[in-house]
Amino acid sequence: MIAKKIKPFAIAPADVGCRNHILGAFRAIGELNGQKLNPDNLFVLPDGSQSFLEVRTALVYTGFKSYREFTEKLFDLLDEYLAHKKQIPQVFITVYNPTESHEPGRNADVLCRAVKEYYKIRNLGKVMTVVLSSRYYKYRYVDLINIPKHLMTFSLRIRLIRNKNLRKKVLITMGTIHNFTMQAVVDKCDDLQAIMKKYEKDADLASIISKLDNFKHKEKKVVFCLGGRVEGSEIVFDINYVQKLYSDAEKLVASGYGVVFVNGPRTPSTVTDYLYEKALKNDNIVFQNCKRIAQIKEDYAPSAWRIYSGPHEEEFRKLQKLGNIYPGVLGFGNTLAVHTMDSYSSCETASAKIPTAVSCRGLYIDPAIRYDCRNLAQLLCPKYAIDFDEFVSMACNMKIEPKDLRPRLLSNPLRVFAETVVKRLNQLG
């Protein structure tokens, strides 16, 4: 099969990181096609959302009582989705997501099994199944398994070498497949500046826009990109850790830096409150909430921790007019992107040639369960990124700036991924 005929699709995930992995895969296939694929047409929406950007509830096998109940839901979604398609997609893509349950491998494999069964029952021909950012797992229904290096251990490498059938399906990459580019940063930076100009006299936004304008004109800058907790207890992302980060931010401010904090869906609401309240008192530190804000009763349940609920809901709703300032704030020049060790986003900025740091100290991560986090930090530092504590010391004592770091560019695996998809699809016939 030639690349131009390939059409991929996916079930839209609720997790932003997973969505970005899938968008990267779509972009890779589109670029090999020589065309820009519209993601609005490639995502199956699992929860009645109007856009893949608005999905709140993921389709997860372990969340159903039985396989039959799961397939009934999936088949209904696929029937509705494919009823409007002129071309039946041949490639189904999903992501190994350890943040949504303790059985991410099983969830991905069963989803791929169900998709293959749907194609067989509906006489749609063969479908190739792909799982991104996976750990080692004995998949039965996945045709292409992307395993980033940081998700492997020595013992898992040995197991993979010994499993010839599984090994044939594996594509190992340095870093993750993602949708982050420097051009996107530039475009988002232009959008951010246009919004700042539009709302500079807005009563709700004037204060934060003034602080962002101050940040923009600083000669050196730092943007903290926060990760957060997961469903289990293996990552402890708490106030103690964030107090340490904020203290480091104050040291950098004292050395002439402008600082921005942006949270994410996994950032605890208590941490969000702490940073917002602290930043209000410092003209050189900006905090912008990027979590969804509670709207309905279900959003206040403990299980809805990815949605912000707390004392600052009204303030954050007013600030929504500004939009998500990340990654636009990375585009002002001489800026360091600081990622917490629990996040894979460090791969994104490192591959876009943005000076990147990884914050490890003070963040507890169970090494037996989430060895991938430490592995990624060790793979990136010091070749492609810098340890954040080292940077703080160098910035404060030696006047080192982000532009002085000059890290090596982390290669983006998009093309090799797309070429592998074409090759495997041809092998499947």
Predicted regions and their residues:
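Leloir-type glycosyltransferase catalytic cores
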Residues: 194-204, 374-429
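Structural motif
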Residues: 7, 89-93, 128, 144, ...
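Conserved catalytic-core segment of nucleotide-activated headgroup transferases in glycan assembly
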Residues: 222-225, 229-270
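Short acidic-hydrophobic, aromatic-tinged amphipathic segments that line or gate anion-handling sites
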Residues: 171-174, 285-295, 306-314, 321, ...
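A nucleotide-sugar donor-handling region in carbohydrate enzymes
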Residues: 140-238
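Active-site and donor-binding regions of nucleotide-sugar-utilizing enzymes
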Residues: 9-172, 178-180, 300
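A donor-sugar binding/catalytic signature common to diverse glycosyltransferases
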Residues: 15, 318-371
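Catalytic donor nucleotide-activated moiety binding site of glycosyltransferases and closely related
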Residues: 254-318
